[in-house]
């Protein structure tokens, strides 16, 4: 049973929107269309861009103790992964309109930058890939 989105913590939202440790890579071109829908990012509108990380939750949590960097918004609670991780970028295609959210799926190996907070200190926001 998934918790209602209203009671979702920032850490739980991060997991829902960005974690997919079940697959090492997303070879299917329809991966983003399926996952964006399954993870509730196409309700009411199409989320324009989203990144899924194909690593264990423990490995992504560990980024919070790696290199401290500035976030895009100027805050100082972002952390960059030491190594490149398997990720999938989902980008809304230019002509796609809600409710027909149609995404381009692209796979990469990149360093991720996440914002971390709380106790335990865990990712709550996906900031960037480099």
Swiss-Prot record:
GO terms for biological process: defense response to Gram-positive bacterium. Residues 1-6 form the signal peptide. The active site is at 18 (proton acceptor), 125 (proton donor). It is found in: Secreted. GO terms for cellular component: extracellular region. Pfam families: RnaseA. Endonuclease that catalyzes the cleavage of RNA on the 3' side of pyrimidine nucleotides. Acts on single-stranded and double-stranded RNA. PROSITE patterns: RNASE_PANCREATIC. GO terms for molecular function: lyase activity; nucleic acid binding; ribonuclease A activity. It comes from the Eukaryota. Its main location: secreted. Substrate binds at residues 13, 16, 47-51, 72, 91. Its EC number is 4.6.1.18. Belongs to the pancreatic ribonuclease family. This is Ribonuclease pancreatic. It comes from Cricetulus griseus. Glycans are attached at residue 40. Disulfide bonds join 32-90, 46-101, 64-116, 71-78. Pancreas. Monomer. Interacts with and forms tight 1:1 complexes with RNH1. Dimerization of two such complexes may occur. Interaction with RNH1 inhibits this protein. The gene is RNASE1.
């Amino acid at each position: 049973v998934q918790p209602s989105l209203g009671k979702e913590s920032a850490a739980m939202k991060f997991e829902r929107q960005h974690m997919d440790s079940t697959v090492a890579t997303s070879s299917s071109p329809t991966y983003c269309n399926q996952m964006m829908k399954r993870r509730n990012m196409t309700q009411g509108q199409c989320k324009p861009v989203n990144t899924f990380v194909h690593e264990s939750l423990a490995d992504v949590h560990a980024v919070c103790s790696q290199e401290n960097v500035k976030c895009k918004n100027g805050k100082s609670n972002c952390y960059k992964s030491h190594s490149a991780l398997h990720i999938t970028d989902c980008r809304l295609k230019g002509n796609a309109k809600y409710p027909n959210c149609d995404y381009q799926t692209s796979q990469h190996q990149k360093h991720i930058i996440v914002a971390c907070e709380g106790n335990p200190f865990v990712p709550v926001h996906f900031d960037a890939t480099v």
